[in-house]
Amino acid sequence: MSEKYYSLHNHTASSNARLIDSINKVEDLIQYAFELGLSGIAITDHETVNAHIKAIKYVEKKRAKDEAWKDFKLILGNEIYLCRNNLNSVNYDSKKDKFYHFILLAVDEIGHEQIRRLSTRAYEHSFMKNRMRRVPTYYSVRRRCQNGS
């Protein structure tokens, strides 16, 4: 691993909570990234952090058994859906409202905690529309992130 290369946008089967998006098992995805010689990989499922614990445990297990894994970087993230403030099932207009996809990557444990909190808030505001669970992260979240709250 002389040159650093990280794959920063990857989905696992945990992304399938709302629709079928990926067949990647967490362990298989991480193992394959290592076998390809990547320096690390980010887990950025669709508005879920469910795979993070499994990913952390897998990498820790590999590091404990194999020195070659010591520099492999696991990056924890989330693909959020940014939308207008206060969007809900009553005021949602499929012709006007957009859910912009943004990738968030945690640089440390504080960042990972913030991502988990954002995901929780998004699910607290989620709603069903046209057989799809909408999981909004409101634009106003930018101020919260900048202020660290």
How would you label these PLM feature ranges?
Residues 1-149:
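Phosphodiester-processing cores and adjacent nucleic acid-binding clamps
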